[in-house]
From Swiss-Prot:
It comes from Clostridium botulinum (strain Hall / ATCC 3502 / NCTC 13319 / Type A). Belongs to the endoribonuclease YbeY family. The gene is ybeY. This is Endoribonuclease YbeY. One of its GO terms (cellular component) is cytoplasm. NCBIfam families: rRNA maturation RNase YbeY (TIGR00043).
Amino acid sequence: MIYIDNRQNKIKVNEELENKIKEIIDYALKEEKVNIDYEISVVFIDNNSIKEINKDYRNIDKATDVLSFPMLDYEDGEVFKDIYLNYEFDESDLDEGNLVLGDIALSLEKAEEQSKEFGHSFLRETCYLTIHSVLHLLGYDHMEEDEKVIMRQREEEILKSFNLHR
């Protein structure tokens, strides 16, 4: 189950965008071997809202593009398919039968700014940020160079499957 909640009014959100976000999340999770019913919440916000969240959770007082709040625990360098592929989740891990993977806060205002800066479509930038965040929910990171290379490769592979190039 993918929940999308638009809490901003600076960028128009249409059904096409919401459907593409859901489609790309579902595809990424299948590619990453998430073989259980799941729940992810995506909240579209503006720069002011994401700045507040970034300050509250990361002590960084500036707007960013996307923030991820994973619900599962991962050891350094391990991802969902390494740990949870055949894991037996019990009822306390589930919400109405769905594994809660986490929440995504995405600034559509920042996505629009970055799409212009990088010279590609708003849809491509929003999908990229969504995939980036979903991979964080699955344990991927980019703090170390070797992890960054792996994460960027997965992002690009998923984007190419949707014909979304830079």
